[in-house]
Amino acid sequence: MKLTDNVHILKWVDEMAALTKPDEIVWIDGSEEQLEKLRHEAMGTGELIKLNEEKLPGCYLHRSDVNDVARVEDRTFICSKRKEDAGPTNNWMDPEEMYKKLYEIYDGSMKGRTMYVIPYSMGVVGSDFAKYG
């Protein structure tokens, strides 16, 4: 199921899927049915814990994996054509060099996993000013 006819978005999703090779692609549609399915999956892995319904109805505790949340300074880069644009306290790398490194890292990175596509609009849908992703 695809939730857009925007050829640029569809092309990008296809390119990322070809690169990362997920077992499945799920487009998030915002439905209650899909929300409940995702909650059930997350509770099954222990990521999501349903709290006491009497005291906190409809509430959950979500814990992120400790390996997913911290920024590692020595692996954080400002990518620009000119090194001086990164500033004196930042790591710098040429964008083309970084893209090459990242494509190597991402190649096959989603094997055995599900890719979730979450459509969004920055701005009113249909507006000349809206940006879609």
Language-model regions: role of each:
Residues 1-133:
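Conserved internal helical-beta-strand scaffold that buttresses enzyme catalytic cores
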